[in-house]
Amino acid sequence: MTNYGAIPTSSHPSPAIDLEYISRAKHRIKSGLATRRPWKSMFDFESMTLPHGFFDAISRIKTNLGYFRANYAIGVLFILFLSLLYHPTSLIVLSILVVFWIFLYFLRDEPLVVFGYQIDDRTVLIGLSVLTVVMLLLTHATSNILGSLLTAAVLVLIHAAVRRSDNLFLDEEAAAVTEASGLMSYPSS
């Protein structure tokens, strides 16, 4: 029996839902990259001085890690990428794992449902972490990856300790208040 003139029903999700998911992912990636600070500001050599002491170094590290968080993440990923160029299998496996992390953990708004069961974020985090460790062990590039991550961490900590943080503003309101108070202050006699 045929149904002429009937509107066909589709068994796959509509393209509008797919486009919505892609645009939401694009928005999250853009908002994450929007926190990136200018590289010129990060590597301003006039702002590089040795800290006065241990607590000054700790204070600088905390401030700079918060301020340059996206820049440091890009730098760490770049160092990791460079270290995996000589291990193409590991690079492919790591790329697949990054896609899993992005879509199953970072870009997911609603809870993950598998076979009708709702899985919480902690379970997804543990599962992805175990999968990542197992895959890194299977590719025999674990020492290379750990070495590159250790190198990147040391470089980030050195930069964060040496980069002065007194001229950084975590939000635009603080910058405006400081500029206004600087313009309105009068020298005391």
UniProtKB/Swiss-Prot annotation:
Short name of one Pfam family: PRA1
Swiss-Prot/TrEMBL GO biological process terms: vesicle-mediated transport
Domain of life of the native organism: Eukaryota
Record's GO cellular component terms: endoplasmic reticulum; endosome membrane; Golgi apparatus; plant-type vacuole; vacuolar membrane
Transport recorded as keyword: yes
TM region positions: 65-85, 87-107, 123-143, 145-162
Classification via InterPro entries: Prenylated_rab_accept_PRA1
Principal cellular location given in the protein's record: membrane
Free-text disruption phenotype from the record: No visible phenotype.
UniProt key word Cytoplasm: no
Membrane-topology descriptor: Multi-pass membrane protein
Record keywords, A-Z: Endosome, Membrane, Transmembrane, Transmembrane helix, Transport, Vacuole
Localization of this protein: Endosome membrane; Vacuole membrane
Tissues showing expression: Expressed in hypocotyls and trichomes.
Functional note: May be involved in both secretory and endocytic intracellular trafficking in the endosomal/prevacuolar compartments.
Family membership noted in the UniProt record: Belongs to the PRA1 family.
Subunit structure: Interacts with PRA1F1, PRA1F3 and PRA1D. Interacts with ACD11 and BPA1.
Name of this chain's protein: PRA1 family protein F2
UniProt lineage: Eukaryota, Viridiplantae, Streptophyta, Embryophyta, Tracheophyta
Gene name tied to this protein: PRA1F2
